[in-house]
Amino acid sequence: MASLPLCRSPSSLLPSWPHRPISASFNPKNPSSPVAAHVSVQETPPQPQDPSPPSDSNPNGTRPSSSSNTRFLWVNPNSPRAADVARARAGSGRRARLASAAAALGACETTESAVEAALQAAFPEPPSEQDAVIVLNTAAATRAETAVLALRWFLGNAKVRKKVILYNVVLKLLRKKRLWSETEALWAEMLRDGVQPDNATFSTVISCARACGLHSKAVEWFDKMPEFGCSPDMLTYSAVIDAYGHAGNSEAALRLYDRARAEKWQLDPVICSTVIKVHSTSGNFDGALNVFEEMKAIGVRPNLVVYNTMLDAMGRALRPWVVKTIHREMVDQQVQPSRATYCCLLHAYTRARYGEDAMAVYRLMKDEAMGIDVMLYNMLLSMCADIGYVDEAEEIFRDMKASMGAHSKPDSWSYSSMVTLYSSTANVLSAEGILNEMVEAGFKPNIFVLTSLIRCYGKVGRTDDVVRSFGMLQDLGIIPDDRFCGCLLSVAANTPAEELGKVISCIERSNVQLGAVVKLLVDRSSSESFREAARELLRSSRGVVKMPYCNCLMDLCVNLNQMEKACALLDAAQQLGIYANIQTRTQTQWSLHLRGLSVGAALTTLHVWMNDLYTSLQTGNEGLPPLLGIHTGQGKNTYSDRGLAAMFEAHLKELDAPFHEAPDKAGWFLTTNVAAKQWLESKAASELVTV
């Protein structure tokens, strides 16, 4: 038997029947090929005209170019894939047609004829309702007038089952552009067309009124809902609750919230955030906190908006400890803070003068490259000026000047805070340097800057510079206000007698009535006239300056050893209710409350109180309680570089008074009735206090 060959020539392997050409094969792994692929679920792939194998003249085995430009994928019509392929092909063409229609609509003129021509060209056949919705939604960036004209064309030419759907699409466009008058006009057209509005219509119109700031209109449209047989949903409730709150009708907002709860609506973060905001706006911060705790108790998880709203509310309430708790909870719940979160934290901590916390938030924002505008910077600088954070303020001020954004550069308030900071620490050179820098930056000194500068000069005893700064006020055409006059009065209280006339002249030129009272105070022969003039001054002054005026006048009396006039001022202040609840009495303790008083006012009050105690012992009408206490508060005093507690401790030692600082009650000095009685009896009434 002849042996079979181990291999055959390639030509012997080719089949003898016509085979599918290479051009009809399908290669999905090469989608970038320039060859076009035709998909057919009906036609068989075209047969090549030349089924013979490639000739020797084409050694690479490729087909002629006329046959290699087209690829065909034949899909069996009975295959499950056939319907999907057909839908995909049809959907692609429809999307392209609708996108082209939307583009044409956006490019045409805002006239009825232009819109009609564009849509007729795009839709030779009547479009469906869905086509109309897609085109109107896609063309949402177009002009509102064009959208309304397109709506009218679709209503007249499309196969529309529910006209209200198309109206709602255009109403949402008007809401986005905040066009209230156009919204009302389209509503009227809708009713004339006999179209019944639905819940989505009312929700859109109400939220449009809210977005336009027309909160009374939002409430008005909410009241129309029952007339058309519509019931509000959660979004509508939320929008109207917010509208009631902004309209100042917090009671109606809360009634609506209670109604939503009574009707078993599932509370969501949107409604809760809105109610919290209503409570915060009306000043009911406990109510805001209750809603926040209630939503968590029923399983509604607070989102970022709710947390930010609560942080803002508690910051307004001056409850920084609650702010810290909420922020800690927010971090524990893995809710990612936003820039608004950190702004709320800064607001809360700077207002409450939580220096360390505020600076920590500031540095975090700086590290995260968050935008810090001049308003936030100024809040930080104001806090630093009040609590004496010199190094921190200088760091912030350097950051402001180094900032690249124009919205972060120092303004007049920034310079004012820096001058106030240096003035409070009696750093004259730095205060003057900031003032010069302010002028070079193109800002004129305002009354706050000059007030701080005068206070600084007064602290270091530079009376001539006080007068020079007062002249700057007049040169700039600035009218002195009550705060400025109070500053001059404070400077006068610490000015030596030989230079007092210079400051009194400035006071008289700023406020004639105040200057007259100070002149009578200095004149030792005018006791009765001073009493009447001082009473009239305190009675006619604004409420916020009554106590500062009284404090400074009593300081001046004490420094000039005019105790009779100081007592007259205290009596007038108590009768006018300026000093309220200075003394409190219980069965176990009599207390003197001096917190907020200047040193001179506190010493005068102590003088009067101890004389009253001595009188009680002499008459025997009323025995002393087991405990006597003096509350001075703790920390720095507004009217002195030293705290009132430190001043009083030294003064009580000079008097050899038996009051001692309480170890468990900061700012309190206590004694027993036995020790007080022995000390009072050892002193004559006129010797009780030497001031």
Swiss-Prot record:
Biased composition (Pro residues): 45-56
Taxonomy, superkingdom: Eukaryota
Transit peptide region: 1-35
Region of interest (Disordered), ranges: 1-76
Keywords: Chloroplast, mRNA processing, Plastid, Repeat, RNA-binding, Transit peptide, Translation regulation
Extent of the signal sequence: none
Residue ranges with Polar residues bias: 24-33, 61-76
Feature: compositional bias, Low complexity: 1-17
Any Pfam family matching the protein: PPR_2
PPR repeat segments: 163-197, 198-232, 233-267, 268-302, 303-337, 338-372, 373-403, 411-445, 446-480, 546-580
Traits of the deletion mutant: Pale green leaf phenotype.
PROSITE patterns: PPR, SMR
GO biological process: mRNA processing; positive regulation of translation
Listed GO MF terms: mRNA binding; rRNA primary transcript binding
Domain (Smr): residue spans on this chain: 592-677
Localization per Swiss-Prot or TrEMBL: Plastid, Chloroplast stroma
GO cellular component, one term: chloroplast stroma
Alphabetized PANTHER family for the sequence: OS03G0856100 PROTEIN (PTHR47447), PENTATRICOPEPTIDE REPEAT-CONTAINING PROTEIN ATP4 HOMOLOG, CHLOROPLASTIC (PTHR47447:SF12)
The family this protein is said to belong to: Belongs to the PPR family. P subfamily.
Protein's UniProt name: Pentatricopeptide repeat-containing protein ATP4, chloroplastic
